[in-house]
UniProtKB/Swiss-Prot annotation:
Pathway: Lipid metabolism; phospholipid metabolism. The keyword DNA-binding does not apply. This is Glycerol-3-phosphate acyltransferase 2. The lineage of its organism: Bacteria, Thermotogati, Deinococcota, Deinococci, Deinococcales. The gene is plsY2. Pfam families: G3P_acyltransf.
Amino acid sequence: MRAVVSLAVVFVLSYLLGSLVAGVLYSRGRGEDIRGRDLPGGSGTYRQYGKGAAAAVTLADILKGAAAVGLALWLAPQALPLATALATFGVVFGHCYPVWFGFRGGGGIAPFLGAMLVVAPWTLLATVTFALALIPLYRATLQPRLRLNAIPFATVVAVPVGLLIASRLGGGAEFLAGSAAMGIRAVHLLAEQRA
């Protein structure tokens, strides 16, 4: 029973932490709301406010992902990897659907990176390297035909490869949990664009 309570606390605290979306906080500090023009992650903040703001927002979002997993390691060490998977899902889902900001948040990439940085840094490094290597190849071959931004394409291809890498290097449960939360958000964003 105690483990169940610990897991519930980990999930709720991770979700609430994820709901503190740095891009929204930054833009509100300027008397605006970035979500009226863009997503509140690092890329949207870069487009709206420049490099310095984007770096600060991205770092804050990465740190909250790392903090959520650290919280899981501290509160529920007896329930690993379930605790860290719940923390990863919670912080990413909270970033995407923040309770503090009307359930309208970012895409979840930075908190996912932060969580994976703590749980499975080698899995993260290998997956990001693979995704970045795909981008120039995609732009040279498929992008003219598909007319889809390179980042979503690289993400779609890198997630299954990342799961394969995680099965060898570790962090599979957390990788799957974070990918699931980002996948829900991606489907939601695509549905909004088509409506």
